[in-house]
């Protein structure tokens, strides 16, 4: 037993992701002159423009039988021009530092509470964001959650969302109400840009 590990131990995880485009050399300055060719050659070991990069460190700690938490730090670079199709005055790349706390509390044999806090710091796009969420699970079927996302950078907008989920056997029914921010939404491997919405879901 150590001071860091304690009675239940401490988990440490480090993940690195780095994605770049191809190192391309165009064969013709005018694309209209290209016939029967891809239009460029590629260096086998060269690297093109940075598309996406992140380094994240995660610490998981069990404090007692009824409480455990995870702390995560992410350093992220996002090519807004390539991945989001941003143009004009929007920044080409977004550099962000993200801090996440995720805590789980076992209140009884049938009731559990999960809380999540996030802080995103960036000088690009809309600036800093904070996020908070509380999720109450009542076994075996009911889950209630309330979340708040707030831009403390440029827009000063609030995005509050509440939801109720009921599960019975193989069936699951969910009802949500609130406001969602505009941006990239990925579902089932398909990503698309969605507008800001408010209503029932």
What are these regions (language model features)?
Residues 1-33, 37:
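Long, internal scaffold/assembly segments composed of regular secondary structure
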Residues 23-31, 80-88, 125-132, 148, ...:
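Outer-membrane beta-barrel translocator domains and adjoining extracellular loop/strand segments
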Residues 36-43, 82-87, 114-118, 145, ...:
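Extracytoplasmic loops and strand-loop junctions of Gram-negative outer membrane beta-barrel proteins
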Residues 16-22, 73-79, 117-123, 138, ...:
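Transmembrane beta-strands of outer-membrane beta-barrel pores
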Residues 2, 61, 105, 119, ...:
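Residue-level signature of outer-membrane beta-barrel architecture
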Residues 164-171, 195-201:
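Outer-membrane beta-barrel "beta-signal"
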Residues 49-55, 95-99, 126-130, 156-160, ...:
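Residues that define the transmembrane beta-barrel architecture of outer-membrane proteins
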Residues 8-11, 65-71, 109-115, 140-146, ...:
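Repeated loop/turn-to-beta-strand initiation elements of outer-membrane beta-barrel proteins
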């Amino acid at each position: 037993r150590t001071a860091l590990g304690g009675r239940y131990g401490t988990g440490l995880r480090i993940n690195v992701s780095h994605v770049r485009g191809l190192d391309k050399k165009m064969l013709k300055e005018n694309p209209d002159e290209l016939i029967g060719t891809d239009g460029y050659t590629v260096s086998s070991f060269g690297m093109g423009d940075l598309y996406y990069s992140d380094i994240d460190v995660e610490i998981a700690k069990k404090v007692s039988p009824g409480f455990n938490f995870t702390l995560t730090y992410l350093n992220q670079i996002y090519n807004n021009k390539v991945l989001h199709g941003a143009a004009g005055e929007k920044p080409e790349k977004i550099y962000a530092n993200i801090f996440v706390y995720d805590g789980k509390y076992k209140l009884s044999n049938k009731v559990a509470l999960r809380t999540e806090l996030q802080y995103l710091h960036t000088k690009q796009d809309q600036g800093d964001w904070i996020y908070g969420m509380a999720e109450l699970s009542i076994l075996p079927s009911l889950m209630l959650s309330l979340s708040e996302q707030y831009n403390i950078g440029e827009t000063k907008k609030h995005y509050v969302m509440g939801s109720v989920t009921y599960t019975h056997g193989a069936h699951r029914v969910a009802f949500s109400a609130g406001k969602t921010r505009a941006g990239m939404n990925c579902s089932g491997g398909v990503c698309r840009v969605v507008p800001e919405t408010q209503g029932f879901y």
